[in-house]
């Protein structure tokens, strides 16, 4: 996504999780619980990335412009925060993410894909959307392509989340996110 979150940018009421877990990471993958994705080579681990409604979140990012990043992350959506079904949870995540401080100057979005799918044989929901911004601090950034997968991990207390945000129109970074998505798997 984009700049660091600000407290006043959200127009959607999103939960703030109190669940605190931290899955051990490796040099080649990002893991949250049982959801795993390969890291994108050359993108740096981003220990500052967070989304208020997601626990156990781990991310790698690449600077596009000063103040504008592309990234991928895996995390956990918790039933105690209202995340119990993949479709509704994917939609809530998109609403919360698009209206968060990461998209300062949010000016709209266009949904491209909204469909049921599977990840490693597990039921999942996929959304791909273009999120548009008009941000005077980063005038060259038009927005991001956002890819969200919410995965039923077979646990009643949590769902797996993959989220990728890559600079609109940036074929190289979009391609790297697509390659990472193809490595998504459920472990254990």
In which residue ranges do the predicted regions lie?
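Short N-terminal helix-initiation segments at or just after the protein's N-terminus
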Residues: 12-22, 70-73, 89-99, 103-108
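Secretory pathway targeting signatures of secreted, lumenal, and periplasmic proteins
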Residues: 29-89
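Signature of long, low-cysteine stretches enriched in small and polar/charged residues
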Residues: 91-147
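Short, well-ordered beta-strand elements
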Residues: 157-166
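N-terminal targeting sequences that direct proteins away from the cytosol to non-cytosolic compartments
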Residues: 1-53, 165-188
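Short, solvent-exposed coil/turn segments at beta-strand boundaries
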Residues: 42, 153-157
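Extracytoplasmic/secreted proteins, especially bacterial periplasmic and envelope-associated proteins
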Residues: 88, 92, 176-179
